[in-house]
């Protein structure tokens, strides 16, 4: 979410006296923040206050992201209690009433200890009613319905909202944009569409008015923003291989099980590292960090003894890594669209065949009838499900680069119609609408006062 709005925030901050606070309503959004990443450094530059929900479910405010992370940090014992509670109340064990009840008790105990810890930590409590004083909110309206946003939704109901999709996507083939009937119209939301193909979905499924739909392309693909990001990387972080293939990480999941992820990685290692003598740099997904199953998979398949020799991790921004890479490989990620903005192709290795939830009559399918996800369906990636296909596309990229990437770039331009200066355009539009709303509020106040004086 932050990554999408940062280029616009940068332009807004160039205007006088604009204060922008970052709000984290979900615990997981701060839990998975990687403070050594380029994205964290960028966000720290442009945030004023940081408002976040603590483990006790209370709201706090800190002047910087670093201080918010320090206040949010929980002990190892607390993490284990929270994880156990989650497994018992939401996992497979929850079908047993006694275990689910135990999980709820553990959750209550965990929150109590968090409450005590927060009281002694020196964190500053935040009064949610202060949100009524803000002039606008930058958000993704698609996520407005989430339970964690319920309090914010109530406090911000009269505040103008400006929305961009939190991750790049082919929304026009997503379930959220395919609804049976029109919803109630609403005038409090302005949406900056990345593709004109999103318009009908926003109108029908989210009630957005025509005059509040503004085509913006993809602001984070502005050339000055990409240049700004690349210039931010420190010399220490530049210590990566001179030539490499970028792996865009994704945690193991029901659609990419640990076994399937292992197989894909083995095939990638065999083709890229063994056959073509190339190296791998892995940009991990925020949920892959730590000592979980995903790191164990990388260490097991790629060989921990080979770390720094044939493969390594990097926290650098995807644009920086993408520019340095030969090409990228993903397991399913919106970053593939970012790669096309810098003229780099991505091979998506994902096999959904035989998975009941993803290989059904409702599944998207490619020309060969294979079940696929959105990016493969709309031809923004080179899709593979097996080693032979991977070998063919790697050969094609290495030997016929322009011919291989050209169709992908054509689809990118067709769908999104990107243009330079999008972030400035969006910032100016937001500023204009906020000022207009402030003037209308002043007029309403004047009218109300006059009507009262006549009574």
Task: Identify the meaning behind each predicted range.
Residues 1-225, 288, 336:
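Active-site and donor-binding regions of nucleotide-sugar-utilizing enzymes
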Residues 14-22, 275-280, 308-311:
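A generic structural motif
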Residues 220, 287-342:
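Donor nucleotide-activated moiety binding/catalytic core segment of transferases
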Residues 210, 306, 334-418:
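Catalytic binding pocket for nucleotide-activated donors in carbohydrate/polymer assembly enzymes
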Residues 220-300:
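Conserved catalytic-core segment of nucleotide-activated headgroup transferases in glycan assembly
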Residues 135-136, 190, 244, 279, ...:
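Structural motif
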Residues 417-455:
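C-terminal alpha-helical cap of glycosyltransferases
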Residues 126, 316-317, 389:
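Short acidic active-site motifs
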